[in-house]
Regions:
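N-terminal glycine-rich anion-binding loops that anchor highly charged ligand groups
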Residues: 30, 35-58, 83-88
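Small-aliphatic-rich amphipathic alpha-helix that forms the alpha element of a beta-alpha
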Residues: 67-91, 112-120, 196, 200-203, ...
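Beta-strand->loop->alpha-helix junctions that form or flank phosphate-binding loops
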Residues: 27-32, 131, 212, 228-240, ...
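Active-site-proximal betaalpha loop/short-helix elements
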Residues: 99-101, 189-264, 304
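Glycine-rich anion/phosphate-binding loops
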Residues: 29, 62-77, 101-112
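Glycine-rich anion-binding loops of enzyme active sites
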Residues: 48, 55, 88-177, 296
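Helix N-cap motif at beta-to-alpha junctions
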Residues: 271-277
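Acidic, Ser/Thr/Pro-rich beta/coil linker or hinge segments at domain junctions
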Residues: 3-4, 8, 237, 284-359
């Protein structure tokens, strides 16, 4: 009698998947079909939501070193995309290239992270692919369902709409900073996709995006897609994660850099027409969700916030494009950002000089 696990590859896949919870809608067992077969009851007005993402740069740059976190984030980056469109997850497909000399304990922790993240989000690994190569590369594709055309997109915000976030911002960039600088300062980083909030805000939010690439990238993308500007509330810094502000202070860096970096905290940023704010507050109370107001949409193009009691416009295009430079390292990344900060400070001094002259 043949045994599937007498083949090395089959045995490896069995060992990898044995601790995963099995989806109740999955038809085939392990190895039984070329594609995973699911019993999905799709109604006429329901939609499939599909997204895919890889964990590559974070591993190569040393932001993610812990195998458990790598596994956790492989799932969460995709779940966050589903949350942004108000989808309920069906499952994830995980594709991984493993170095042949990879320590078994590393591999075990990697898949513990994947499995725990799925449990946290109420979903399942429903399939995938495992291969071997020179370096670790891992990605996942997530599938979700939205009901009765109840989905959010990045399009729809209008001047006068109010901006909210599902939680405090900045922890993603603070964590990346500590890892890239190999700092003794430590901050816990284990984001959870805001699936519950994403569904709750449907019908209230006029647009929605996640902060997977950092808050400024999200704000800038909304401005470009909707041809609007954004003005942050005066107390925007109060909406930054407290421990992250301590980290940025230790490094002697301006607080707005917690918004600027492109390693996010996986919150949702969404806009709400002002007449629907009372509904949002009611839902927030009923579902024990904590939405934070952070700004408003305006006609005046640009991204404006208050720094040291003076309103400035951040050059979001320049800030985003800095991250695309070749041969990335922390110093070459921070230098142009600090040059921007210095320019903002000079503009502020010039403003007050002109004000004094006019008196």
């Amino acid at each position: 009698m043949y045994k599937l696990n007498s083949i090395t590859e089959n045995k490896l896949i069995e060992n990898i998947t044995k601790n995963y919870n099995r989806s109740p809608i999955q038809i085939n067992n392990l190895q039984e079909s070329d594609s995973e077969l699911l019993n999905i009851n799709i109604l006429e007005n329901d939609q499939l939501a599909i997204t895919t993402d890889s964990i590559v740069e974070e591993i190569e740059m040393g932001i993610y070193k812990d195998p458990y976190l790598i596994g956790w984030m492989t799932v969460m980056v995709n779940m966050s995309d589903l949350a942004a469109v108000s989808a309920t997850p069906v499952g994830v497909l995980v594709s991984e290239i493993l170095p042949e000399n990879l320590d078994e304990s590393f591999r075990t922790k990697l898949h513990e992270g994947i499995n725990d993240a799925c449990k946290e989000c109420g979903t399942y690994v429903i399939g995938g692919d495992t291969n071997f190569g020179k370096q670790l590369i891992i990605s996942a594709t997530a599938i979700g369902i939205t009901k009765n055309r109840m989905f959010n997109t990045r399009i729809g915000c209008k001047p006068g709409d109010v901006l909210y976030t599902t939680g405090k911002l900045g922890i993603g960039n603070a964590y990346a900073l500590t890892q890239l600088a190999e700092s003794e300062c430590q901050i816990e980083y284990k984001p959870v996709a805001k699936l519950k909030a994403g569904i709750a805000i449907w019908g209230i939010a006029s647009c929605c995006i996640d902060t997977s690439d950092g808050a400024i990238a999200a704000f800038d993308q909304l401005m470009r897609l909707n041809n609007v500007g954004i003005k942050m509330d005066l107390d925007w810094a109060a909406k930054l994660d407290t421990n992250s502000k301590s980290i940025i202070y230790e490094f002697g860096l301006p607080k707005w850099l917690l918004l600027a970096g492109q390693h996010g905290e996986f919150e949702l940023i969404f806009s709400v027409p002002s007449e629907k704010e009372s509904i949002l507050k009611k839902i927030s109370s009923q579902l024990s969700l904590h939405f934070l107001r952070i700004g408003e949409i305006q006609n005046n193009k640009g991204f404006f916030l208050n720094i040291n009691d003076h309103q400035v416009e951040l050059p979001t295009e320049k800030i985003r494009n800095i991250a695309s430079q070749k041969n990335f390292n922390l110093n070459t990344y921070l230098k142009p950002l600090l040059e921007i900060d210095n320019s903002l400070q000079n503009n502020k001094r010039q403003y007050f000089d002109n004000l004094l002259t006019s008196l």
